[in-house]
Amino acid sequence: MDWRVLIVLAPVIIAGSWALFNIGAAAIRQVQEFLNRDKLA
């Protein structure tokens, strides 16, 4: 694989993984809030 391809793809992969990480963290937070609300009711 050409090094130029890596230079082009690296920022895209980093941004994609960062977005997935943030979405996953937000989803876990929402699930935890939902479970906590379920216990309080």
UniProtKB/Swiss-Prot annotation:
<keyword id="KW-0812">Transmembrane</keyword>
<feature type="transmembrane region" description="Helical">
    <location>
        <begin position="5"/>
        <end position="23"/>
    </location>
</feature>
<keyword id="KW-0602">Photosynthesis</keyword>
<comment type="function">
    <text>Loosely associated component of the core of photosystem II (PSII), it is not always seen in crystals. PSII is a light-driven water plastoquinone oxidoreductase, using light energy to abstract electrons from H(2)O, generating a proton gradient subsequently used for ATP formation.</text>
</comment>
<comment type="subunit">
    <text>PSII is composed of 1 copy each of membrane proteins PsbA, PsbB, PsbC, PsbD, PsbE, PsbF, PsbH, PsbI, PsbJ, PsbK, PsbL, PsbM, PsbT, PsbX, PsbY, PsbZ, Psb30/Ycf12, peripheral proteins PsbO, CyanoQ (PsbQ), PsbU, PsbV and a large number of cofactors. It forms dimeric complexes.</text>
</comment>
<dbReference type="GO" id="GO:0015979">
    <property type="term" value="P:photosynthesis"/>
</dbReference>
<dbReference type="GO" id="GO:0031676">
    <property type="term" value="C:plasma membrane-derived thylakoid membrane"/>
</dbReference>
<dbReference type="GO" id="GO:0009523">
    <property type="term" value="C:photosystem II"/>
</dbReference>
<comment type="similarity">
    <text>Belongs to the PsbY family.</text>
</comment>
<protein>
    <recommendedName>
        <fullName>Photosystem II reaction center protein Y</fullName>
    </recommendedName>
</protein>
<dbReference type="InterPro" id="IPR009388">
    <property type="entry name" value="PSII_PsbY"/>
</dbReference>
<dbReference type="GO" id="GO:0030145">
    <property type="term" value="F:manganese ion binding"/>
</dbReference>
<keyword id="KW-0793">Thylakoid</keyword>
<keyword id="KW-1133">Transmembrane helix</keyword>
<keyword id="KW-0604">Photosystem II</keyword>
<dbReference type="Pfam" id="PF06298">
    <property type="entry name" value="PsbY"/>
</dbReference>
<keyword id="KW-0472">Membrane</keyword>
